[in-house]
C-alpha cells in the first residue's frame, strides 16, 4: 500500500537519523561508539499517544495532509537523532566509567519558543531531566510530555564528560 511504502521510506530516514546521532555523540565524547540495533529500534518505534511512527504517518497520508506529514517526519527525525545521542552517552558512561553532562542548546533565532529559550545553556547530569517554566520536562529535545514543546523543535544537546572543559 501507499502508506506502507511511505512508512518504509521514512524508516530508512529514521535509521539514518539514529546513526547520525551516534556519530555526533562519538565526536563530542571522542570515543568510538557503534549502533546498538535494539536501542535503535526502541527509539524509532517509541509509542507516543498510543501510536507508533507508522500509525502517525498513516494518519497524515490517509488525510492527504502533506504539510502535517512533513512536520511529523522532521519531528520524528529530530526525536530519533536526540535519542541516539543520549543512548550513545549512556553507552560511553557505562563503558568508560566517566560521568556525562548534557547542555541544552537552541539555534538562537526568533523561532525558538520561550520554553526552550529558558533552557538555553542549562547543563544537567545525563540521567537528569530539563524542566521548562510551563512545568514540562524532558531528558532531551523531542521528549517533552507536551506535544507543543516537541513539534518543530530544533534544539540539540552538547555532551561533555566530567573531565572535559566546557
Each predicted region: which residue ranges?
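Domain-core detector
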Residues: 1-150, 158-166
Amino acid at each position: 500500500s501507499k502508506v506502507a511504502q511511505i512508512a518504509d521510506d521514512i524508516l530508512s530516514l529514521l535509521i539514518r537519523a539514529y546513526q547520525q546521532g551516534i556519530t555526533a555523540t562519538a565526536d563530542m565524547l571522542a570515543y568510538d561508539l557503534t549502533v546498538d540495533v535494539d536501542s535503535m529500534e526502541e527509539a524509532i518505534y517509541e509509542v507516543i499517544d498510543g501510536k507508533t511512527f507508522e500509525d502517525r504517518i498513516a494518519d497524515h497520508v490517509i488525510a492527504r495532509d502533506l504539510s502535517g506529514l512533513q512536520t511529523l517526519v522532521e519531528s520524528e527525525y529530530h526525536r530519533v537523532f536526540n535519542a541516539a545521542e543520549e543512548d550513545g552517552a549512556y553507552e560511553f558512561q557505562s563503558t568508560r566509567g566517566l560521568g556525562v553532562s548534557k547542555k541544552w542548546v537552541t539555534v538562537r533565532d526568533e523561532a525558538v519558543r520561550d520554553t526552550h529559550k529558558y533552557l538555553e545553556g542549562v547543563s544537567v547530569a545525563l540521567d537528569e531531566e530539563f524542566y521548562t517554566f510551563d512545568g514540562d520536562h524532558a531528558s532531551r529535545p523531542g521528549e517533552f510530555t507536551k506535544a507543543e514543546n516537541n513539534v518543530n523543535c530544533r534544539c540539540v544537546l552538547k555532551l561533555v564528560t566530567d573531565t572535559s572543559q566546557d
